[in-house]
UniProtKB/Swiss-Prot annotation:
GO terms for cellular component: plasma membrane; side of membrane. Disulfide bonds join C30-C47, C103-C108. This is Lymphocyte antigen 6L. The gene is LY6L. It is a lipid-anchor; GPI-anchor. A lipid is attached at G117 (GPI-anchor amidated glycine). InterPro entries: LY6_UPA_recep-like (IPR016054), LY6H/LY6L_nAChR_modulators (IPR051445), Snake_toxin-like_sf (IPR045860). It is found in: Cell membrane.
């Protein structure tokens, strides 16, 4: 008798739990924008059910004392390829960096921290210029 009462008491709980398991999960959310100059122009958006990752691309080109940044962020079904960072210097006093990141949790394609993004590039460039000037003066 005790078993019957225990079974009857736990049955509604099991049915309620089974109902929760069938509720659809929310889609991934990512920041989304295309070739903008500021992360504030990248609003968050819900991805389609097929999208599994967030992608972030940042192109930074430094010309002497100015910096040009282009950001693109979006949802995607998979990563196009691994995370990468490509640097090049097409001319003296011109430096470029392309950074691509792929991640799979909500709003993970945020803006880069100052250590990761354009300020690090500008700081590195200023340090190189400063050291060159110091060598020239000595």
């Amino acid at each position: 008798m005790e078993r019957l009462v225990l079974t009857l008491c736990t049955l509604p709980l099991a049915v309620a739990s089974a109902g929760c398991a069938t509720t659809p999960a929310r889609n991934l959310s990512c920041y989304q924008c295309f070739k903008v100059s500021s992360w504030t122009e990248c609003p968050p958006t819900w991805c389609s059910p097929l999208d599994q990752v967030c992608i972030s691309n940042e192109v930074v080109v430094s010309f002497k004392w100015s910096v040009r940044v282009l950001l693109s962020k979006r949802c995607a079904p998979r990563c196009p390829n691994d995370n990468m960072k490509f640097e090049w210097s097409p001319a003296p006093m011109v430096q470029g960096v392309i950074t691509r990141r792929c991640c799979s949790w909500a709003l993970c394609n945020r803006a880069l921290t100052p250590q990761e993004g354009r300020w690090a590039l500008r700081g590195g460039l200023l340090l190189q210029v400063g050291l060159s000037l110091l060598r020239a003066l000595l």
